[in-house]
Design a protein with these regions (language model features):
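Extreme N-terminal basic, low-complexity initiation segments
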Residues: 1-18
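Ala/Thr-enriched low-complexity intrinsically disordered regions
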Residues: 14-15, 33-35, 48-51, 59
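Cysteine-centered motifs
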Residues: 28, 38-40, 52, 60
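Internal, well-folded beta-alpha domain core
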Residues: 153-311
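Extended, compositionally biased
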Residues: 124-174
């Protein structure tokens, strides 16, 4: 079996998540996002970082991510023909809440040519909150106002005939009107709402989000207390978060929009008391507390050129 170095090419030791993925995907043709030296005879000494789990990483993010890439697509990766767009964002203090749902509940929300993605014969719905910061157009143009906001989204998990894994958004709430209008014009169903991050105090510092839609159309309040000593390394947690694109319908056509970033620094977390009407408003019924609660300090992202999904 080919061996991948546990040190990144910038000299730093690989993170526990990267090491776990290296263990799970040690074969050379399924190289994970650990920039190392491949000992495969055909590629001996070639420094690589593949899209097997984390999707293609554009060269212009290489210095930020501390890694290089051969931009191949893999089992959970994005489109091998990934073409980066000059749009970058940072996603910070990400709280992931997930519930297991029947596959039949997700089917009606899939665009043509897209089907629910499954993990152990089940699919999931997610309620995710995070802060968007440092939005840039091109290498130098920052958007300090329009590009800084709070987002809360409800999403399902999808896969198309080309094997691209992604998400289908049922709703996205954000507190920056300019961004909402631009995103809706691109076919992404953003809603302008009152959104804000909250900090919870207890035995540890927690992170949460509050959303209130205008005209009383729904609200949500949720959060999590992360355990920063326990990285989330299980297969389900990686499957839920290693999503590097979204499927969306624009008019009569369906597109896959790739999004590239380095591996999530992902941690187990405990849910705080929460009240949510957004998942129900999106048409999905869940019962009880979430089945999975995760937290990430965040990642730097770059959007790619949309690809049409052929049904």
């Amino acid at each position: 079996m080919p061996v991948i170095s546990v040190r990144r090419h910038d000299g730093r030791r690989a993170t526990p998540i990267e090491l776990k993925l290296s263990e799970l995907h040690g074969q050379c043709q399924k190289r994970i996002a650990v920039a190392g030296v491949c000992s495969c005879p055909q590629r001996r000494g070639v420094r690589t970082m593949s899209a097997c789990v984390y999707g293609p990483v554009p060269a212009c993010l290489g210095s930020e991510m501390g890694a290089e890439t051969d931009a191949r697509a893999g089992p959970l990766g994005g489109d091998a023909r990934y073409v980066p767009l000059p749009v970058k964002q940072s996603w910070a203090d990400v709280v992931f809440l997930h519930w297991r749902i029947p596959v039949a509940a997700a089917h009606p929300y899939m665009p043509p040519g897209v089907e629910p993605d499954l993990y152990a014969d089940t699919t999931w719905v997610g309620l995710i909150g995070f802060r968007v910061t440092c939005t840039c157009l091109g290498p130098h143009l920052r958007l300090p106002y329009a590009g800084t906001f709070t987002e809360v989204n409800v999403r399902l998990y999808s896969r198309d005939a080309a094997g691209r894994h992604g998400v289908v958004f049922l709703s996205l709430d954000a507190d920056r009107l300019a961004f909402v209008l631009a995103a809706r014009a691109a076919g992404v169903p953003y809603v302008w709402s009152r959104c804000r991050p909250t900090t919870m105090r207890g035995t540890s510092r927690g992170h949460g989000y509050e959303v209130e839609r205008f005209r009383g159309q729904g609200k949500s309040s949720f959060g999590a207390y992360p355990d920063m000593d326990h990285p989330a390394l299980d297969g389900l947690s990686l499957w839920l978060t290693a999503r590097f694109g979204l499927h969306t319908r624009v008019g009569r056509r369906v597109f896959y929009l790739p999004i590239a970033h380095r591996p999530w620094p992902l941690y187990c977390a405990a849910a705080a008391a929460f009240e949510d009407a957004l998942v129900r408003a999106a048409g999905i019924t869940v019962h009880g507390p979430p089945d999975s609660v995760l937290y990430s300090p965040g990642v730097r992202t770059q959007f790619g050129q949309p690809r049409q999904v052929l049904g």
